[in-house]
Amino acid sequence: WPFLLSDKVYRFNQPFTEKESNEKYLISLSFSQEKGLSVPAGFVSGQNIYNLFSELTIGFHDSIPFRDLPIPFACVSANMIDGKEVVMDKGRLPLAMRARMAIPGVFAPVTIDRMVLVDGGISNNFPVDVAKNMGAEITIGVDLSTGLKDEKGLDNIMGIVDQLTAFMGMKSYENNKAMVDLYMNPDLKGFTAASFTAEAIDTMIQRGERVARANWDKIMALKKQIGL
């Protein structure tokens, strides 16, 4: 995961000149005659994670309606040009997935149809309304947020970005939370979106199972309601 969430290239894939420069310099910046020296749009361009998404979605790279997938799918991004929410329910699946995770300042935005798209969390981070508009009669929402951070959680760029995202999407979040049929919020304090160690993953799975078991009667009631 550290490799996927970076712009690194495996050393054996690098030409000699690139290997040499990587050993000498800590950072690299773009330079062109038109723009001169330019600062990147994100700390990470996201090519490695996009390559992973492309590999995992082989067979669904053409422009398709996502509701025709084996499990209907949609995701939410935000257009940085006008600030509007963009529900991505068609197009190239790996590109939509990459746009959805373009955390501002961390991952570079994705440009699609003249829109500059970033993580939809700033506009709609709990999109129950999107699921209902797609035809979902019963919605079960698993909220992975851990609430607003205190001063200890705001000592790094990721914490600050998370807090800004939470503030910007607060109204939409509360509205969607109110309309979900079953709300579950596992305790993920102490973990971040980059917690990919085996120990962290096992702990988060256990906490998720604990919340599901605590809501077992409600889950069974919903199952009975839809006739299963």
Where are these regions (language model features)?
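Patatin-like phospholipase
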Residues: 1-228
